[in-house]
């Protein structure tokens, strides 16, 4: 996999009006404890169900012989705000450590911690770098974040953080977040970005508070699916360009924008199994190709119908048309059974590969059964008991001390043992009867 965007916890210290998720907000007392406990409870299973190796083959950088280099992927850890108390100590640091340990002997992983930046301190930067974080990405450089309105405030904020980062030996990333290979720089590095009008997220997704506040300026021409953080290439997990989004409850989505239904859960299934179960499913092949308007062709939705379904009305009552709306409606109306079928396929596959533990058998009964089975076989000097794997003495296996004697009648092919110093003459009469 090249990239995963992992939202670890819903808690945030801000409630920005342009945010794409209503659940990113301040929580207090019991509510805060509840969302932190959810993150704590789920992250071990989520990490366990990530790919065994976090690498990908880069088709954009072939070797002279036509083969493709294997490169290390990245996982972006986000919130909410990933560095507030108590999320930082109880969730973020532990997730970073779990990822480091999981991939240490498997080619590694580039860990990016995304933050608003205003909670950063020298001690926190030190803690992150000590745990092997490759990049700290500050994602608040825009007019929507209270206190950072305007170029002057934004510059002062970036200058302050840059000085802090550089005190710890970090350097500023020379590549933007939209550059395909930005994660190939040697770390540790830091970066800044925000929802500015000229950025890749500047028009804002039709989601969350951005939608409720009428802030999304996207039109039908803005295909969020066919770009980074969209669904483009999400099924091609072994190649460059692959990315999915994961939420605190383990839900997996093909894009950061989030489809109306998750494609699976990491609390149930391995990520690669989830993706493989959707390979060849027309709707999800359309998403991975960056053409959501073709999602419904196999279900009677023409491209014209999909585009018509992409028209809606904003909460303020104005017309709005974007392919994300059509995708939402297609998921709601059609894809529920399709996703359930994929889930059932995964369940059946697990049942075939999960070993069944044999029922417990007491030791004496096990020896007795073994002796009975062996006593019905022709004597072979080199044979072994099929249960205990011990060598036969030429006729039958001897039971362990304390085993119940066999009461079976030898078959016609069974040869009676001849007394010898090492043979069954030492057994009791009842054992050889």
Residue ranges of predicted features:
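Flexible mid-to-C-terminal extensions adjoining Fe-S/redox cofactors in radical SAM and related proteins
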Residues: 22, 263-378
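Conserved alpha-helical substructure of the radical SAM core
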Residues: 1-110, 122-123, 131
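C-terminal accessory region of radical SAM enzymes
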Residues: 166-226, 251, 257-314
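Extreme N-terminal, non-catalytic leader segments
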Residues: 372-414, 430
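A cross-family glycoside hydrolase active-site/sugar-binding cleft signature
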Residues: 7, 76-80, 112-116, 137-139, ...
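Hydrophobic positions on the alpha1 helix immediately C-terminal to the Walker A/P-loop
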Residues: 419
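Short cysteine clusters
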Residues: 12, 16-19, 237, 250, ...
